[in-house]
Design a protein with these regions (language model features):
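Conserved "HGTGT" condensation-loop signature of ketosynthase/thiolase-family condensing enzymes
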Residues: 1-85, 109
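Short glycine-rich or small-residue beta-strand-to-loop segments that form or flank ligand, phosphate
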Residues: 85-92
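Acyl-thioester C-C bond-transforming condensing/cleaving domain
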Residues: 2-8, 75-81, 95-169
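Cofactor-binding loop segments of dinucleotide-utilizing enzymes, especially the Rossmann-like FAD-
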Residues: 19-21, 92, 154
Length: 169
């Protein structure tokens, strides 16, 4: 007689408790981009599906955008910064080797004393971060009075964009 396997979905003890986001305020449409490059709105839409994109201004630093998103997630979860045991930031656009973006965010959200590190793995970085966060919670690497991990995916590609080059604009 077959025996039914009983499994849980996900790992016990690890779950998403808050979500936050930040998008730059400036909305740029294809017509504005096309004024700088040899292209058309139709060409861009057909090949990429892009109609608008967000460009960060000088006040919208990578640290500010990541910290704002983290603050919103903490607020939604009802968690304070001093309860955060680790901050993981997935990014490829942080232009400084040190301090890490995660260390800067840790300070901004009031989580000083917790672990902090960046993950540089392009598009997969955030997924790796979520997996590592779940492992940290389940293994007890974070816990006690700091049981939470904040995972952030943040990019500021405006700094790396050549606005006159069709392949990056």
């Amino acid at each position: 007689m077959p025996t039914a396997l009983r499994t849980t979905v996900g790992a016990p003890g690890a779950r998403l408790v808050g979500l936050g986001s930040y998008r730059p305020t400036r909305i740029v449409d294809n017509d504005e981009v096309c004024r700088r490059i040899d292209s058309t709105d139709e060409w861009i839409r057909t090949r990429s599906g892009i109609v608008t994109r967000r460009w960060a201004d000088d006040s919208e630093t990578l640290t500010m955008m990541a910290s704002t998103a983290a603050g919103k997630a903490l607020s939604e979860a009802g968690v304070s910064g001093d309860q955060v045991g680790c901050v993981l930031v997935a990014t490829v656009s942080h232009l400084l080797q040190t301090p890490s973006l995660a260390a800067s965010v840790t300070h901004e959200i009031g989580a000083d004393g917790g672990a902090a590190f960046d993950i540089s793995a392009a598009c997969a970085g955030f997924v790796y971060g979520v997996s590592m966060a779940a492992d940290m919670v389940r293994s007890g690497s974070v816990g006690g009075d700091r049981p939470y991990v904040v995972v952030i995916g943040a990019e500021r590609l405006t700094d790396m964009t050549d606005f006159t080059d069709r392949s990056t604009a």
